[in-house]
Each structure stands twice: as C-alpha cells, then as structure tokens.
C-alpha cells in the first residue's frame, strides 16, 4: 500500500528541461551533512540534491539544520525573482533576526561541520549510554510509590525524531 515506486529526481529533471517546466524538489527537513556515521537515518544532503539539477530546492531551516523555524529556498536568481514577485512573498519572508540566526547555524557547518555547536544534531547523535544515564537520573527522582503505582520502568527502544525531520 502507499507509494510503491519512486521516480529518480534526475529523470524528473530531464523531463522538466525537455518541456521547459521548472522542477521543484521539496526535501522536507534538509541536512548539509551525511549523517550515516552517526546512525541517523536521513535524506540525501542538500549538496547532493543540488547536483541532481532541480530548478528549486525547498527544505527546513530548523528540523535537521538546527536553526530557527524557517523554510529555505535554493534556486537561480531568475527563479527567486519569480517567487519574490508573488504577492504572498511579503507575508512569508524571514525577518532580520531569523536571517541572522540562520547565518549563525550555517556558519557553524562551514567552520566545524558536525559539532556540539549544533544542538539539534548533537542531541540526535547522543550515544545510547548517555541517554540511559539521563533516564536513570530522571527515574531516580520519581517516588517509588509512583513507580509501583504506574508500573514505570526504563526500557530499551528505537525511535526516530518526529515532525518529519527524518525519512
């Protein structure tokens, strides 16, 4: 059920170029780094999508990047000018504070790649042992009467970040 096949972006780009139709790739979360070595299942990095040639790329400035809640549009100047000419643009453009915050988070990638300066990624990549210690610390603060009453325990599990951050 659901989606059973996916058309490669490169094929969609070829059709778009052939018929002069702009191709938009909506990444959802967006990340600048491959997160495989941190055991974080994520989509392709934005740079890999750029190489595939869509005219417009959309992704989140917050979810995986760790910046302020925002949407990022990567496109040619021509496409950006078309987008900016839409009257809705004024209502959805970022303010100066959001732009300054995005600049800081993007600079952290440029300077450090993956680092503890990026809270979102450092929390997602936190080792399981660290999470167990935190869980035990919190658990130890719960009165034993409540633990017994509600049948509370610390259990191993595997979950993924929500809100569409990860595929």
Language-model features and meaning:
Residues 139-167:
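Catalytic-core signal marking the mid-to-C-terminal active-site face
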